[in-house]
């Protein structure tokens, strides 16, 4: 009998804790939704080093650690009461607002492109970008903040490396599932796992796949690439009818519903580092990348996914990388009041001039990349809607 009572008590406690996990997931296991921001009213001093790059998490055990880990920059970031990055220079009004993901938030630079845009235009520019946001989260934030004050321009910084894929992802943690909730709790309590190590070569030394040697004219760079960001550039001809594209349309609808018709609207098309610099990878290493290439295809269920597609004709391959840009242009052509600001030509031209616009060990822009983006966007805005 005592054993039965003990077992019954344990089952009751387990049921209560499970209920608590599902009712209060954010408190017990952390944010469950991608839209949740954890930076409200925070100030942080950032020292950004090569080893802080996101490629080490994206490609565990595959990236050779940098020989020189001296800081790129040191700066301070502050976020407002809603968890969005505060402008470098406060203004009384913000007639321009930018939305997007980590490229827009600019966590790893002192001055994101929103600040450069404010300088170029001479007006306040509000930054509503946040890390890991996709079209669904951008739509939610647009509904709340796009018309928080009168706007002349509203911009969506659309990162072509993952926004289309993130359009159909599930929640960060599915708190509706007891199994998923318990797994998330165990993951939170478990000690950090050791960082995976690269397999040894014949001599026993680690064999790393990254970074890759890049030569542009007289300049040499070691750059780490995340290949699937390049894969997302090759969208299929029927991509506009995919579920992913429908979610992008819904995000555009959210902006339209929030804004008066006279507000100018634009999607800023942000190319990934892989799109801009992969053509300059040294030929032998580029052949390795080409052999492992995949491209986007439409699944029977209507979502976009990947399929192996080794590169046989490089010229045709590089031409195909404009497909994603063309898809977004087509979606914007379906509605009034929107224009496309494509950063690809300016970034390709700058790369050809041997300028490095992304961090070597990170997928994001360095300060030069943000500065160039601000310049291109400002010129487009000055041309009018």
What kind of feature is each model-predicted range?
Residues 1-11, 25, 29, 360-385:
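Histidine-centered active-site loop/cap adjacent to the catalytic His
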Residues 15-36:
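Membrane-interface motif at the C-terminal end of an N-terminal transmembrane signal
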Residues 29-123, 312, 316-322, 326-328, ...:
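Membrane/wall-proximal cationic-aromatic binding patches
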Residues 95, 105-185, 197-201, 205-208, ...:
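Conserved SGNH/GDSL esterase-like catalytic core that processes O-acyl groups on lipids
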Residues 100, 129, 155-159, 266-271:
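Short beta-strand segments
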Residues 139, 245, 249-252, 367-378:
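Short, amphipathic alpha-helical "lid/cap" segments that border enzyme active or binding sites
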Residues 160-327, 348:
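Serine-dependent acyl-ester chemistry module
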